[in-house]
Amino acid sequence: MGKVIVVGIGPGSYEDMTIRADRALQSCDAIVGYGVYVDLVKERYPDKAFYETPMTQEAKRCALALDLARAGKTAAMVCSGDSGIYGMAALVYELRGESEEPEIEVVPGLTAACSAAALLGAPLTHDFAVISLSDRLTPWETIEKRLTHAAKADLTIALYNPASRSRPAHLKRACDILLRDLPDSRLCGIARNIGRAGESWRALTLGELREAEVDMFCTVTVSYTHLRAHETLAN
């Protein structure tokens, strides 16, 4: 019996990958993941067997890794950012069920909120909330409730999955919810393609964020009341 290692590879660059993640990928027999994430590591580990699945096929991806482990292989399931924060770790455990085999190891990684904050300056310097705007698995009513309470609590908010082709207006809807409790002058930031080709970031207000163009490769921050501009924005 082999094992499944669920590996958080960080935002994209090798420099942002942990030593533990690198060692896990060096030691495995096969690397499984969403095609975009597999492409980020394929060049550095050319001797591995690679298995890719498209977007929305997370269960198939995890089942494949478990099948490889049952066949005696060490399968690394790669996840962007951290393996447990919107990653595949929970689903791998769920699909394995109550059995203790195959063995599962979870390797953490640098999540997008932290790497985006490093680009933008120091927007996460105090308490903060991380909220995904994807309603594929979470009802929008639940997301709206979380946004409302985070705004009322005056937390800095990191927004994951702000938009995609199937939900292009979700960030605008989120901003409308936040604007019920926050001023349109509230400092915000957008980081895109963190650690990858075309990396970029910009600072803007909440009012401007409502009209901004974003995609699934963006991470958004909305600051709390007392964060000063020179703390938030990289020079």
What are these regions (language model features)?
Residues 143-186:
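Conserved anion/nucleotide-ligand pocket segment
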Residues 214-224:
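C-terminal edge-of-domain segments
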Residues 225-232:
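Conserved small/polar residues in nucleotide/adenosyl-binding loops
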Residues 3-7, 73-77, 128, 153-159, ...:
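Generic beta-sheet signal
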Residues 170-208, 213:
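Accessory alpha-helical/coil subdomains and C-terminal extensions
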Residues 1-104, 115:
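Class I S-adenosyl-L-methionine
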Residues 85-153:
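Class I SAM-dependent methyltransferase SAM-binding "motif I" and its flanking Rossmann-like core
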